[in-house]
UniProtKB/Swiss-Prot annotation:
This is Virion membrane protein OPG141. Its main location: virion. It is a multi-pass membrane protein. InterPro entries: Poxvirus_A14.5. The gene is OPG141. It comes from Vaccinia virus (strain Western Reserve) (VACV). One of its GO terms (cellular component) is membrane. One of its GO terms (molecular function) is ATP binding. Residues 1-4, 51-53 are intravirion. Keywords: ATP-binding, DNA-binding, Helicase, Hydrolase, Late protein, Membrane, Nucleotide-binding, Phosphoprotein, Transcription, Transcription regulation, Transcription termination, Transmembrane, Transmembrane helix, Viral envelope protein, Virion. The lineage of its organism: Viruses, Varidnaviria, Bamfordvirae, Nucleocytoviricota, Pokkesviricetes. It is found in: Virion membrane. One of its GO terms (biological process) is DNA-templated transcription termination.
Length: 53
């Protein structure tokens, strides 16, 4: 279900990402991507294990 605020929220997130893309260094970008992928992987494993039990 799409709420009324979601398009605005997605627009704000997109603008922030574009702003940060030009302001932060490549090493910081790689560190952020690695951290996000790690969090998503841990979340996936957590839910997979709990659905299998």
């Amino acid at each position: 279900m799409i709420s009324n605020y979601e398009p605005l929220l997605l627009l704000v997130i997109t603008c922030c990402v574009l702003l940060f893309n030009f302001t932060i260094s490549s090493k910081t970008k790689i560190d952020i991507i690695f951290a996000v992928q790690t969090i998503v992987f841990i979340w996936f494993i957590f839910h997979f294990v709990h659905s299998a039990i």
